[in-house]
């Protein structure tokens, strides 16, 4: 997220939600403090593999992203209960480390084995079949309306009774379908929360813009994170 925000890259792909573990908090927090635009979403089935430089031998340390470790926790407890688990920024970074450290392994996509010249010691080590992750496509320009779109919003609320009910009621009154609502602690503000809301529709629609004008009166720090084609 930060690389796109700083202009170091033109676009980025980040995980936002997993069907097993829920929201990816690190991505949500990065979105709060950045000015990037969500311009798309994709859903990908997640299949984790155990990778190392050799097909056999003891594994001293295992590297992977926190979400991947969580998605395989039961398998890891059963098969690698004594192995040190180390969280890294991405599954790719875990694979890279496993490729240069003796006695190290990684949880990553089988494709990473080809990139980093690793051996696949075990496939499909995720605890639940059908595990799927939703990713955001990030950039600086919004996507055009397609007729089947989704808009992601971010806002905080005033400290008064029924504030969330009133805010969401604005969307309902305008006939907008609420797809998701989730809260996250506000960075640097103990016991205050940021709300992430997904609504069906595109910000270019007249009725949607009218709803946002009303929503702005009921919320604080309202931001449109992006409108983009709905994949599901």
PLM feature spans:
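Domain-level signature for soluble enzymes in the chorismate/prephenate branch of the shikimate pathway
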Residues: 1-232
